[in-house]
Amino acid sequence: MNELIKHKLELLPDSPGCYLHKDKAGTIIYVGKAKNLRNRVRSYFRGSHDTKTELLVSEIADFEFIVTGSNTEALLLEINLIQENMPKYNIKLKDDKSYPFIKITNEPFPRLLITRQIKKNDGLYFGPYPDAYTATEVKKLLDRIFPFKKCKNPVNKVCFYYHLGQCQAHTICHTDKAYWDSLVADVKQFLNGKDDKIIDDLRSKMLEASNKQEFERAAEYRDLISGIATMRTKQRVMSKDLQDRDIFGYFVDKGWMCVQVFFVRQGKLIQRDVNMFPYYNEAEEDFLTYVGQFYSDQRHLIPKEIFIPETIDETLVAAIVPARIVKPQRGEKKQLVALATKNARVSLQQKFDLLEKDLRKTSGAIEHLGQLLGIEKPVRIEAFDNSNIQGTSPVAAMVVFVDGKPSKKDYRKFKIKTVIGPDDYASMREVIYRRYSRVKHEGLQVPDLIIVDGGQGQVKAARDVIEHQLGLSIPVAGLQKNDKHQTHELLFGNPLAVVELPRNSEEFFLLHRIQDEVHRFAITFHRQVRSKNAFSSKLDHIAGLGPKRKQLLLKRFKSMTALEQASLEEIQQLGIPKTVAEALFDHLTSKSEV
């Protein structure tokens, strides 16, 4: 804890409000709320914490706080601050999960559409549906029953659907608003589960067609009735009152929270949402934050009613969500919340079981790898790869795996400084020397195993530096690829030999992951350096444009193509003198005109 934090802790009030933890760069990394700011914020810097909270605290270099008039105000402010700042330690809803809805547009001639985007005052939305297939099947059925406009053609033109009897836009006068209002009302009734009237109408039409011996039309009506019945049976009835509601349940264990939401529409369970995340405060408080964020996301329509667990304060939920908030006390409704809670518990337990299984497999792979090589269990592995094109922009990269998992904070990049031309062995010698001379002289953690991407030449070069130049004793292995650039074999020992390793073993999969990761990291770095060098070299002859200004341009425009499209004003906004900016702009303009 630094002196700034110590001083600020003394100034905290005994009031409700929000606090914002910041890292050394001033970036907000966590937003929280508290009934008592003094007690809550101080708790981070006192006593022991679990691993995830210790990680958060280790990054806190400063904090701010905002006093509010009540706990409810603090909750609302917290949700807004999280949305605005997106702190890395706060709950993040899955951004890849958007459900399909059926939409009736509010155009003069309404259309039925499937969409994943909800826009206010843009029509009526029904759903969500569990997947695109289900939504499409429902829409197909609606298209056959209700003659909405199906295309964007002008209404004075007859379309294909008109001939199928599935579109009446051409025949109904656009001034007949009552017709379209009635049609929309029928669809709303149908999608809200009140489809008895529709079925009765279809049965009447089927009998009428049959009496007229129009058997094809009668069969069409029969199939529509059958389609409605099928749609009914595919949805599980969870509530007899046919109400639209979302049902929340949550469970906490080992510093993690799982929230399950059942989407119930017209008494039928149509989908569920599952989210798991670490929590840092009281479970009830983080659950409230989750609910606020959940409904702030436009992908989630607010139903008429929301069921919550009995441990949650319904007045706080009502303050952030404009719906009827219910804490069921008995019967079927209480069982629904219990079911959501049970599912949350099962999901969280499955997560822990999978993590434990993965940990056992990885730990076993590391231990077995050590046995195969005749060394101690290689808990920390450092792997190296070189990257260049015909010796240009040569770089190298190091990745670190601890307990079989990447430790990205320990990754390192190297620009090759002493090697001229494409010499992979010399490049490896330079990088190994630079890395482990620092390890030796600065007392950094020594790895249990070094892996180099390459064959005998790379391994011998690395081992020679480690043993003879630095006098260290660290095992060095090599990973060779085949002609398809895939992990092929492991080299180790003195003399070097291929280590027999089954392709379907966990040890092989671990080595494959390590080799892929170091290759990815090296290639990415090489592309960045090459792009930067190419960008810089094209601007070398412009007077007044030195390395710092080139760096400014690269940071702002990212590529030469983007810079060539920039205006003179955009270039000058970076603080580049007018004469230099004009010279650069003239150069770029003349180049683009060639």
UniProtKB/Swiss-Prot annotation:
Keyword terms = Cytoplasm, DNA damage, DNA excision, DNA repair, Excision nuclease, SOS response
Report the superkingdom from the record.
Answer: Bacteria
Q: Any idea where the UVR domain is?
A: 196-231
The Gene Ontology terms for molecular function here are:
DNA binding; excinuclease ABC activity
Q: Where in the cell is it found?
A: Cytoplasm
Q: Does the keyword DNA damage apply?
A: yes
CDD domains in alphabetical order: GIY-YIG_UvrC_Cho
Question: GIY-YIG domain: which residues?
Answer: 14-91
Q: What is its main location?
A: cytoplasm
Q: Which processes are annotated in GO (biological process)?
A: nucleotide-excision repair; SOS response
One GO CC term on file: cytoplasm
Chain's role: The UvrABC repair system catalyzes the recognition and processing of DNA lesions. UvrC both incises the 5' and 3' sides of the lesion. The N-terminal half is responsible for the 3' incision and the C-terminal half is responsible for the 5' incision.
Q: How does it assemble?
A: Interacts with UvrB in an incision complex.
The similarity annotation says: Belongs to the UvrC family.
User: By what name is this protein known?
Assistant: UvrABC system protein C
Q: From what organism does this protein derive?
A: Streptococcus equi subsp. zooepidemicus (strain MGCS10565)
